[in-house]
Amino acid sequence: MKNHNYILSGFLLLLPLRITAQEFTAKRYIDTIRYEIKYGRIIIPVTVNQMQCKYILDTGGQTATIWEDAKTMGGKLTGANKVTADMNGKANMYSMGKLPKVKIGNHLILPELTTIALPNIKGFRDLGVVGILGGDAFKDVVMSLVSSSREIHIHYPYRPKGLKLNDGIPLADSETWQVNFPLSFSGTSVQVMFDTGVPELLTMNEKDYLLLAQIYAATVVHKGKGTLGAGLEGLAEPKHLKQVRLDKFTLGGKSFKNPTCLVASDVPTILGAEVLRYGIVTIDYPRGRFYFQPYKQSPVDLSKAAPIWSVSILPARGKFEIATVWEPLIDRVDIGDEVIAVNGKDITRLPLSEIAVSDIFDQITSSEATITIRRRKRKFDINIYRR
């Protein structure tokens, strides 16, 4: 398999608890798993066939493992194949496999876990993980994400004390255990997917944006073109993008005022991991409920949160390229332009990874920077801005 670059409505009724192997190994437990954050990704320890490894927690995806690592841990291909789309809507057919004796924490023990067999993905290697762990691994338990202590609390078979079934938001049915539920803006609901694999607060598809724009609950702030990021299948074809200001939304009684999000076609509408800064998220998978317990009940104003640069840079085709460009630079910078320096620092010898780019921009304290572009045989500087 070739290397890939990465970086990555009906409601359920009350469901009976599933009878699984786990129910015969533990009647009731509460467990705590410490996690780490790397470049906005939640990374958790997992044991497969008594071998330690790490996965990205991705509540919006299905469990997927670099097959080279899976084989080392005793993984076996099933002979089945599955067509799976990445974050950009680009689809490919992957082989399916089984991982033996998967242990998450001290008590969540799965005799086997189905996984998508992935090629060698450099971005995963850079993060020190073997893949992504989806909701399918937690389908029989209640999971709470507590960002204040960087812990995952696993409850089986009941929810944490104080959380009532009727207080939760019902989840839409999902064969892949995605966490989908309605989120309301000015009285109009759109279906969102809670996805810990996306660091941002919100992204939105074009259809949902148009629905909210009709009731004046969404206003375009900036226009751009490009891609929101690299998925398992690499960069998507450039598309029209928007940065949009939304009306407030409420979760768990907490108001989020003036949120912004990026809008593109062919992407899901996502509530990302940034929401964990503001409260505890609990997912009751067996009963299909989503809970949000805010750390503070006071409203939060997001009007100045998460500014973005007027270009984004990603590794592609053996070099660092412009992946996204926003107004007013659309007529001066082309998608695919090679970037050879940032603030005069040569980046052509850096490892071709998104992490290398992130490290450079994380060190910039001002809201302005200069990039050097090489277009054919010509080099020129462009000032870019964070806003």
Predicted segment positions?
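Pepsin/retropepsin-fold aspartyl endopeptidases
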Residues: A21-R387
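Bacterial Sec-dependent N-terminal signal peptides
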Residues: M1-A26
